[in-house]
């Protein structure tokens, strides 16, 4: 597929940002897209700024001059992270990773500018990258119906992005800052940078979609929730959201829960728990980043996640969803949602830090992600008072994968959608549900065919072959033409002909390649599970800085 593409140097006058050197990717000899990689959107979060909210660039910050344009032809630096199926090369790993990549369609923009898709990468909030080859988005932006500027930010992950403790909270309080959720604050600052500067690249700052896959979809939800309840409407940025294969999650852990994780980390690093707050933080900030990564491997509380802080994450958020206020605010602001699933999400999920073959191992593994209260509810829901493997599961590994997939995707999506519909949003007009029961042939390049239509397999549907050597074949392009056009229209802000009319309706790509609308046969199970884990919150667990 890349044989038809070539790279050319591209010097661009970015107005008040200065002059920058990017790339023009040509297709069959004609300019297709312009690419700029690794543009900083915040000051480096290093040294004393490790484990603190991101800092804006100075107003007079310039990326380069006419005589010495800044070189942005590669990608972003990548946050240090534990090994995974896509472990980054050490040469691009750095805590100084608050940068973003931009793809701009070649040619003159529309009258009001290109629509903008701000796309957040996934990876459980622990791993991942916003980098992909500059050529990877040519098919989407030049050879499909989709025309928009793509902005892919890097943000802090794992311990660097989501460590929380009483010591950090005390320091943040004394500095007048928020604590925890640094990765979410990074994303927000990148979104604000985009809103403030994208017009310089030909973008329409009033037409921004936030999208993401997996943890990127969860992050997308967090960005929407934060904006609905913590940002005045006149300062709102988000026009619509696309959440691919994830949902709202459950009420995040409290500071007390997160403190247990921090204590475990300190012990693994050999830092005395009896030290003063200041001494603990000085010791933590003195640890080299590679040692902080190594210390995470094998932790019992392995997942560094969102903190229920009431600054970024409203403590009463689940109540606001359940009582219709979330839907009401979406309706008032005209925000629409695209959200759905792959049929076998669990096949991939059961391979992420898989627990051993026992009830207690699964229980402990879920505790790494969720609060003790939520974990207990989940295990009692499936296992009752017994500690035996429930009927219908081959082993504990499969059980974990299916339960994790229901929490991350299947069941909580349905509960969320139900609350939105009950709150006044309309199927096929405000909320666009979908389901994939087939995958592209090219996906076998990275994901075994026997894993089926599992998590991640639909990314090249939405991004039109991105990241895969062969991309879509001609038959697949015909089958998925309507999906591509629907996504393009959605991001453009126009009316989408999705085909769904009722809350239970899902647009579906079937095994035979055809598209239809089916009735959701897991709707009631999802509502029951949502009520179990996401109702009854009082929103009074206490602020993070208390």
UniProtKB/Swiss-Prot annotation:
Region entry Disordered, spans: 72-91
Its taxonomic path starts at: Eukaryota, Fungi, Dikarya, Ascomycota, Pezizomycotina
Keyword terms, alphabetized: Hydrolase
Which GO molecular function, any one, fits this protein according to its record? carboxylesterase activity
EC class name: hydrolase
Q: What induces its synthesis?
A: Expression is induced in response to 2-benzoxasolinone (BOA) exposure.
Q: Which cysteines are joined by disulfide bonds?
A: none
> What's this protein's name?
Carboxylic ester hydrolase FVEG_12634
Active-site positions on this chain: 214
Catalytic activities:
a carboxylic ester + H2O = an alcohol + a carboxylate + H(+)
Q: What happens when the gene is disrupted?
A: Does not affect tolerance to 2-benzoxazolinone (BOA).
| Something else known | Fusarium verticillioides possesses 2 unlinked loci, FDB1 and FDB2, necessary for detoxification of antimicrobial compounds produced by maize, including 2-benzoxazolinone (BOA). The FDB2 cluster arose as a duplication of the FDB1 cluster with rearrangement and expansion by incorporating additional genes.
Recorded coiled-coil stretches: none
